[in-house]
């Protein structure tokens, strides 16, 4: 269903993968974040979210190993990238963000707001994906 490289995904890491149908056709690509021992976050393309969610709901019933929760409306995601992105975020975050390797993530605060920061952008520029409560998005 979700094809990822064989390596185990460690807590605090993300991996890029593809969501496939039984014939191997690609439904979407997505990032998978491992947030805890049994806690993962899947971020598909926003324009394809409903298709991906329907796909997972179709295949997950009867499998006690997984619980799917659509949290899309509860969170905002901002790709903060460019030559000054890291320096700007470091002024607002209580940590040295340069220590985060590509595809690393950390739950921390930015300007006092609980966020998930992830070095997972793939626009060609360095930076962070910032995931935070939707109600806090405009203020940040």
Predicted regions and their residues:
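Basic, glycine/lysine-rich polyanion-binding surfaces/domains
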Residues: 1-140
């Amino acid at each position: 269903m979700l094809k990822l490289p064989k390596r185990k995904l460690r807590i605090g890491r993300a991996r890029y993968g593809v969501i496939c149908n039984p014939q191997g056709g690609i439904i979407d690509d997505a990032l998978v974040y491992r947030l805890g021992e049994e806690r993962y976050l899947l971020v598909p393309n926003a324009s394809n979210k409903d298709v991906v969610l329907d796909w997972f709901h179709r295949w997950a019933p009867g499998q006690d190993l997984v619980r799917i929760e659509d949290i899309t409306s509860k969170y905002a995601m901002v790709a903060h990238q460019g030559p000054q992105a890291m320096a700007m975020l470091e002024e607002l975050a209580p940590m040295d963000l340069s220590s985060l390797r590509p595809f690393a993530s950390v739950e921390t605060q930015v300007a006092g707001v609980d966020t998930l920061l992830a070095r997972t952008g793939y626009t060609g520029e360095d930076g962070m994906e910032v995931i935070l409560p939707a109600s806090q998005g405009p203020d940040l």
